[in-house]
Structure formats: structure tokens, C-alpha cells
């Protein structure tokens, strides 16, 4: 989904798995800015797909300066012994060798133009050809331990939340990290909520933003170095109840993660 983080995909991966794909490409290298919870989310995606019998290929792109979230994603790909195509590095190498210019590849600072997509497709097909020529005799085994902390190896998703008469949702969970995903629209409204952990307001999120893309956003609500029991609460911001239809459109979901413990 355009303009989203790998943490958004945590909420969509099971829907994708219903299609029973043989292979998925994960492309978040120019969207994820590199925060801890996003590298945890990316590893959670890789592990979940592999655990469900779907193979994974990591795609790395870059901005016009050659930058992306290369470090963490490369480390995860190597750790899980899955293919990684660093298209961004290939693009920058071609530019350094004067084979083409950035504007020949992209229409702006990051998005490929038609010729750029053709270049990407050619490189992916080359990877397929290489894979078919290489004989693989060993069966794939998923690592027993995570590359990083494994916070989203066992993700619990809370969806279709039920609010009480005061439009408050409360739940107690043993966790170390909590993310919230929600819809945001450019259509003007005053629907907003506070998300609290153990009585402390962590985030205030709004359904409206004038520059919204009318898609789903994700926020890291809470992260701790050690898992424990916590009370998570969603309530109207400022004590003012929201329109029920707008609250339904908001469609807030929670992702509950927990560090793997010995």
C-alpha cells in the first residue's frame, strides 16, 4: 500500500495470506525511517510469512541521494537466508558509471517513472532466472531465534474495538510494544481520541488532517525494554464524545507485541 510503513503491513498480512501466495516482495526501504519498532515490525513480517509457508524477497530502493533503511533490512534478509535485491545500489552504480541519470529512472526524488519500473522488472526477472539456474538441495529452515528482539514474532491484533457508553475502550495486556493503526482523511471533522498506557496519555490521534491521503496510518504508542502487564485505553480527546459514524470510520486497531523471553 502506497505511503505506508512496514508496521501497517502487520495488520494486512493475514488478509494477503488468504490468497496463498508462493512469494511476496517486501518493499519498505524508502518508507520506514528506521525506528526500532519498524525494524521489529519488518522482522515480524518476514517471520510470519515464512512461518505460513510463503517465501519472501526483500526489495531495497533508495532516494536520489542513495539512502534507504538498508542496514536493518539487509541484516534481516541475511539472517533469514532470503533473497535481497538492492535495486537502489544498482541504480546509483549505473548513475556513477554514467549509464543513465537519476531523472531517467525517477519522476521525483524517489518514485520510479515508467522507464524506472522497466529497469526494476528487468532486475527482478534476472533474479528469477538466476534462481532457476541454481540448484537448491537443502530444505529451508526458519531460524529458531529472532534477528533482533522478536517483538512481533507473536503479534496480537485487536480489531473491531468495542467501546463503552462513554466511548472508552480498555484492555490489559502483557506486552513490551504497542502500535496503533487508523484511518485518516482530508475531509474536515473534529473526531479525535487519546491513547493511554497505564493512565498516561501517549498519543492524541485525529481522523482529520488537511494533507491526509485518505489511507491508513500507524503510530508507535509504547515501547519498553522489558515486557510487563499494562492497561491500554482509548478515550475521546478532551472528554468530548465523537460522532459514532466518524469513530467507526476512524477504525482504530491495536498491535500488541512482546519481547521473546527465555
What residue ranges belong to the model's regions?
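Short beta->alpha junction loops
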Residues: 1-5
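Alpha-helical cap/lid subdomain in secreted, periplasmic
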Residues: 8-134, 185-189, 194, 198-261
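Beta-strand-rich recognition domains
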Residues: 130, 134-189, 241-262
